[in-house]
Amino acid sequence: MKNNYYNDKFTYLFEKHNIDTNNIKFLLAVSGGLDSICLFDFFLKNKFSFSVCHCNFNLREDSKKDLKLVKKLSERNNISFFSKNFDIKKYAKKNKLSLQAAARKERYKWFDNILEKNNIDLLCTAHHINDNLETVIYNLVNSTGFRGIRGIKVLRKNI
C-alpha cells in the first residue's frame, strides 16, 4: 500500500474494527461520485476481494451517466457488478416517506439481498462530510434524540 493519508485512514479503520481484509469479501456501493470512486480505487489498488453495486434512483439527469461510468469501471477491472433501477418517487408516495428515506430504505434492503445471495461479508459505502451533516440534521428534525447527533456510524452490523 502507498503510504498516504487515505491509505492510513482506511488501514486504521480496518485495524480498529478487527477487519481482516485478506479474508473478507466486500460489496462496495458506488454511486459514481468522487467519494465512492475513491473508495473503488483504494480497494482496486490494494487488491481486496470486492464486488460493486450501483443504485439508479432516476432522480437526476446524470443518473444514467453515473450508471454507465460505474459499470464501465467494474467491467474494465473484471469486478462483479450489480445494478438496480428504483422507482423511488412511486415508493415514497405509496409509503408516505420522503425521497431520501425511501431511497435509503430500498437501497439497504437491496444491499442486504446482494450480501446474502452472494455470500459477501461486508458492505462499504463512502460518505463525505456533507453526507454526515445531512444525516445529523435529518436525525434532529426527526426527533432521534442524542443518538441522532452522532451522524453516520462508521460500522454497523455488516455495513
Place the predicted regions along the sequence by residue.
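Core alpha/beta nucleotide-donor-binding catalytic domains of modification enzymes
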Residues: M1-I159
